[in-house]
Design a protein with these regions (language model features):
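Outer-membrane beta-barrel "beta-signal"
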Residues: 112, 116, 143-158
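Residues that define the transmembrane beta-barrel architecture of outer-membrane proteins
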Residues: 9, 30-36, 67-73, 106-110, ...
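Surface-exposed loop and membrane-interface regions of Gram-negative outer-membrane beta-barrel proteins
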Residues: 1-32, 104, 141-142
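Hydrophobic, well-structured mid-protein blocks that either form specific transmembrane helices
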Residues: 16-73
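Repeated loop/turn-to-beta-strand initiation elements of outer-membrane beta-barrel proteins
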Residues: 6-13, 44-51, 83-89, 120-126
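Membrane-embedded beta-strands of outer-membrane beta-barrel proteins
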Residues: 13, 36-38, 75-77, 112, ...
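Sequence/structural signature of outer-membrane beta-barrel proteins
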Residues: 16-25, 54-63, 93-101, 109, ...
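Residue-level signature of outer-membrane beta-barrel architecture
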Residues: 2-6, 17, 40-42, 77-81, ...
């Protein structure tokens, strides 16, 4: 991929390849997938925002047949909370599957996150995430994949 600045915005372009080892179940669509993506980001001072677009270019993807052209959009906004080490982050994404019979699997996801910078290297946070996935479609082996969740984390970046 490539990332850089074009005028007042940061741009990110690339290819993502998802490879899943092992054989597919008999008659199942390929799980491996290839996506092209483009993203733009801007820091507005009081907040920063990014928009990303992902497009599947492989025939099958993640077990969905004829998924070529499936799209995922994201919008992310980060808002520093005053002069504190806290940042509030908001995410919304929308997945639309191409292919005959794949439309019922379309969904929107969202996340709200509070991050506390402990230092230049470490941060801790909490988040809430959810989707509008349909439970009868997105339940696999008794587990609903679109279940809302609350979590906490400790992160290090260097």
């Amino acid at each position: 991929g490539w990332a850089g600045s074009l005028g007042p915005v940061d741009v990110d372009l690339g290819v993502l390849q998802f490879l899943y080892p092992g054989d597919n179940a008999a008659g199942a669509a390929e799980a491996d997938a290839t996506e092209l993506y483009v993203g733009v980001a801007k820091d507005f001072g009081i907040a920063s925002a990014s928009i990303y677009y992902y497009n599947v270019v492989s025939t099958d993807a993640w077990g969905f047949a004829d998924a070529d052209g499936s799209e995922y959009w994201t919008l992310d906004v980060d808002v520093p909370v005053g002069d504190t080490p806290i940042t509030a982050s908001f995410h919304v994404g929308n997945q639309e599957f191409e292919g005959s019979g794949n439309e019922p699997y379309d969904y929107t996801d969202w996340k709200v996150n509070l991050d506390y910078a402990l230092s230049d290297t470490y941060s801790a946070g909490i988040y809430y995430t959810d989707t509008d996935m349909t439970e009868d479609i997105w339940t696999v082996q008794g587990e609903f994949l679109g279940q809302d969740s609350v979590g906490a984390y400790l992160s290090a970046s260097f």
